[in-house]
Amino acid sequence: MKKLFIALSLVTFFSLESSAQWKPAGDKIKTEWAEQIDPSNVLPEYPRPIMQRNDWKNLNGLWDYAIIDKGGHIPADFEGKILVPFAVESSLSGVGKRINEKQELVYQRSFDVPSAWKGKQILLHFGAVDWKTDVWVNDVKVGSHIGGFTPFSFDITPALSARGSNRLVVKVWDPTDRGPQPRGKQVSRPEGIWYTPVTGIWQTVWLEPVSGKHIENLRITPDIDRNLLTVKAELNANCATDLVEVNVYDGNQLVAAGKSINGEAVEVAMP
């Protein structure tokens, strides 16, 4: 089976230190992949393969963490290190602690923005965080999100430091079966068929530079009966003059193409 690639354009010493700070929590059964975890290079693959950009920065790794009373202030001192993106209850997080509905989990880390990204908008992406999330950059609240399974992102450009390092803080509340959210079989007291809760960041966190006008999402629909591929590019801001171009490649060979304006989907006839 051939793999087809779609290209779109919008016209307008750490490893040693990390290993010393982290080890799996508890005496849990481990797979061969768990044995291979490197805290300085956790899940290094690009986290959004359906819409991949060349420039990005992975923020997975060791973060500071603290467990606080719900509604409490961000602490000045943190309890230790947690390996993102593993849930705080898990062994691979290096923490292995349970959190109740009267507590919140706070994360902190610093990051630098590559100088080559100057003049770009900087997006902060979360693959998934369970459940209610609040995010600050340099003490500026950049956004909130509710939901444990869906990705979300914030434009953090206005909050970034003009020079030097930036401070990222994430606060999470997850009441599990004592709240209103969908939770599957997660319960506060797991037994029988019920599961241990998953709290906090559990998918990749990353930074991405984009232009002022950019593609936010793609909706790709194949029609096998008619040999058509429909591509809907959702832009951060629509304008009638925006031109979206779709190129379909078989390896390095261009096999189909199409264009649209006015926010219309592109229908590409496939060979």
Residue ranges and their predicted role:
Residues 61-84:
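Predominantly extracellular/luminal regions of secreted and cell-surface proteins
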Residues 21-56:
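N-terminal pre-domain segments of enzymes
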Residues 53-54, 98-102, 221-224:
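Short, solvent-exposed beta-strand/turn "edge" segments of beta-rich domains on protein surfaces
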Residues 66-68, 97-215, 238-240, 245, ...:
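Accessory beta-strand-rich segments of carbohydrate-active enzymes
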Residues 209-239:
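Surface beta-strand/loop "capping" patches
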Residues 1-22:
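Bacterial Sec-dependent N-terminal signal peptides
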Residues 150-152, 263-271:
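Aromatic sugar-binding surface patches on proteins
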